[in-house]
């Protein structure tokens, strides 16, 4: 029966060749490829394509056909290309990655075998499963194709479970269905199809797990769809009423039978009480929750409820109960666990004046985290705890935090120990870096795809290399390759992806160049524009949000029109997404206005930019005015912002601003900027 393969299998997407089909250059029976090791490509086996200055007409014609959904033509072009040539590799990979109704599973499987080190193996695996579902071979072939591995798609689950049922192995069918059904978010039609075909086969306990999981994910309709099969209709009706804010929620909660009152019931009742602003009563229920993650069904959802409730209690002045709630968390993901430990440590230190207890929580963040953002926060707050009697040496902790100079807390720590500069040197590639980079097949493919005008496929390769390369020098070469194409968005992504892996990429994570000299912006204004643009659009000049915000600094057309009029400029909506200098000029003017609105406060301006100026003003009324306060009070004010997204946004833009000030003017002053704002 299917089993969970090691994590390596999932990550590298060991491709299962699903059925015989129109394979690349051959006819094959069912094949299985094992876990794919991420080794260096063997370039001696590759027949070099013509130089990049030569025509790429054949490759482009194949990619054009693919873009037009003419799969037959794309496959014909692929077959006409020289065997083992780079162009054939590129087109075979692109066809397999594209998938679609006309791409046989054999094509996908052969591409995976031919290109084991290329990106997108999980996507290829998923496309293979969908192709198998369409081709609908015999149950024996399906079972052999999956070779004991768990499907990754809805189609794969259905075809494999169906095959096991046809072969009389219902136990194996359940082993396929259960892990998928318990957690996967599905469209209503797919959900109904599973219930119709397999509803009676799936155990009631799995239906119950799914019901609760969907409620935790705020997918109420999905949860209600399986409530009957779960044998928990009364709980589902009550929980749905709580989620929707129905007036009869309390009555329905009371009517839930004792047999259905497990952890999910506690969650629904606690959520109801919180929404009724009965925070102490809600806290008492939350503290009754089991510590076992399996019993909680979704431990991370429980953490979110604890966080929201704890902040309400802090606002009520009950720091002690707030601490107890977050300290007893069972958050599962490392990111949520680190966030929970921060809340516990921060409440203990700043609310309860207990540096020893706070230190234990902050130290736990350092154990959980790998990313510079989290590590710098851990060491900074360990230093703060040590300053007021906690264990350890405050200066040592601050020095460790300061080594992460591109982060908010790293910069604060740097000023705490008297550092005048940030360590953001641009990586310098060695001769070895250049040799290694030049021999990578994926790099050659990027250049070829760019020459053919297909940057979207090239970007997949950029991202994959940014997630694999370990040398800052090679990563710098990759970013420069993108910049030379004018793709500042991808140059930034390279730095961000590598930086998130814990690689010291220096200035690579904060590149310059997207704002041209034609932009009418001062030096400090340019640093501010870069800081906002990095967060808002990630330097995607053509970005358009769902709300209609456009371009580098995500300006609304109406706002941009008013700004252009004030500046005596001709307004052009089209230029907002095509002319970075135009967008940046108007955006800098808008930022200047917002800074004026908040008396020069960067903190309030950034909070208002993200959540709206009205909310920023409301938070001033609720939490006090950070303007003119000492730096520790300003940091506390930022951490009190009730919106997680806005808290993070203020810190991210602030750290960006300091990095770009350093890069443009060779100085930074995060303490002065937090306390005094714009001078």
Where do the protein language model's features map onto the residues?
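Catalytic glycan-binding domains that act on GlcNAc-containing polysaccharides
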Residues: 84, 93, 108-110, 114, ...
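Structural register within alpha-helical repeat arrays
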Residues: 61, 92-95, 128, 160, ...
């Amino acid at each position: 029966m299917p089993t969970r393969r090691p994590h390596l299998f999932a990550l590298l997407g060991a491709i299962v060749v699903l059925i015989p089909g129109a394979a690349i250059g051959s006819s094959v029976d069912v094949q299985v490829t094992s876990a794919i090791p991420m080794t260096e490509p063997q370039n001696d086996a590759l027949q070099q394509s013509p130089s990049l200055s030569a025509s790429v007409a054949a490759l482009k014609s194949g990619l054009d056909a693919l873009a037009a959904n003419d799969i037959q033509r794309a496959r014909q072009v692929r077959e006409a290309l020289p065997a083992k040539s780079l162009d054939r590799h590129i087109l075979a990979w692109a066809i397999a990655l594209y998938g679609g109704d006309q791409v046989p599973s054999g094509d996908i499987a052969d591409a995976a075998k031919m290109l084991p080190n290329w990106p997108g193996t999980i996507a290829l695996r998923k496309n293979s499963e969908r192709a198998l579902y369409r081709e609908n071979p015999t149950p024996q072939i399906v079972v052999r194709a999956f070779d004991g591995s768990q499907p990754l798609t809805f189609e794969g689950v259905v075809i494999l479970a169906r095959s096991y049922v046809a072969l009389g192995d219902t136990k194996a069918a359940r082993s396929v269905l259960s892990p998928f059904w318990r957690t996967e978010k599905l469209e209503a039609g797919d959900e109904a199809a599973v219930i119709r075909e397999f509803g009676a086969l799936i155990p009631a306990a799995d239906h119950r797990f799914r019901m609760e999981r969907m409620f935790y994910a705020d997918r109420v309709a999905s949860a209600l769809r399986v409530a009957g099969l779960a044998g928990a209709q009364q709980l589902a009706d009550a929980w749905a009423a709580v989620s929707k804010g129905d007036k009869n929620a309390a009555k329905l909660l009371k009517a839930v039978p004792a047999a259905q009152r497990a952890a999910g019931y506690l969650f629904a009742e606690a959520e109801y009480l919180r929404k009724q602003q009965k925070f102490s009563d809600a806290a008492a229920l939350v503290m009754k929750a089991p510590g076992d993650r399996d019993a909680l069904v979704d431990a991370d959802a429980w953490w979110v409820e604890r966080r929201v409730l704890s902040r309400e209690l802090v606002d009520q002045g009950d720091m002690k109960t707030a601490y107890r709630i977050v300290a007893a968390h069972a958050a599962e993901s490392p990111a949520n666990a680190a966030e929970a430990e921060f809340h516990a440590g921060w409440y203990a230190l700043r609310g309860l004046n207990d540096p020893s207890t706070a230190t234990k929580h902050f130290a736990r963040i350092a154990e959980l985290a790998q990313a510079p953002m989290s590590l710098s926060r851990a060491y900074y707050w360990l230093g703060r705890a040590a300053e007021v009697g906690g264990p350890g040496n405050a200066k040592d902790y601050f020095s460790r935090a300061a080594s992460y100079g591109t982060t908010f807390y790293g910069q604060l720590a740097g000023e705490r120990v008297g550092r005048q500069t940030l360590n953001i040197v641009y990586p310098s590639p060695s001769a070895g870096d250049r040799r290694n980079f030049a021999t990578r097949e994926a790099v050659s493919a990027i250049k070829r795809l760019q020459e053919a005008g297909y940057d979207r496929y090239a970007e997949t390769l950029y991202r994959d290399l940014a997630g694999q390369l370990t040398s800052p020098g090679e990563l710098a070469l990759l970013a420069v390759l993108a910049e030379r194409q004018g793709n500042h968005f991808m140059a930034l992504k390279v730095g961000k992806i590598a930086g998130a892996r814990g690689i010291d990429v220096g200035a690579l994570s904060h590149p310059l160049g997207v704002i041209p000299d034609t932009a009418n912006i001062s030096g400090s204004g340019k640093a501010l524009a870069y800081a906002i643009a990095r967060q808002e659009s990630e330097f995607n000049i053509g970005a358009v949000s769902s709300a209609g915000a456009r371009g580098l600094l995500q300006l609304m057309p109406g706002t941009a029109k008013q700004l252009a009029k004030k500046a005596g400029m001709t307004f052009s909506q089209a230029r907002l997404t095509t002319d970075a200098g135009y967008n940046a000029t108007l955006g800098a003017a808008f930022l200047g206005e917002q800074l004026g609105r908040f008396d020069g406060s960067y903190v309030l301006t950034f909070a208002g930019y993200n959540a709206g100026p009205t909310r920023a003003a409301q938070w001033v009324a609720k939490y006090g005015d950070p303007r003119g306060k000492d730096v520790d009070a300003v940091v506390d004010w930022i951490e009190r912002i009730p919106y997680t997204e806005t808290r993070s946004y203020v810190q991210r833009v602030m750290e960006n601003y300091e990095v770009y000030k350093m890069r443009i003017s060779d100085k930074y002053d995060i303490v002065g900027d937090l306390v005094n704002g714009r001078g």
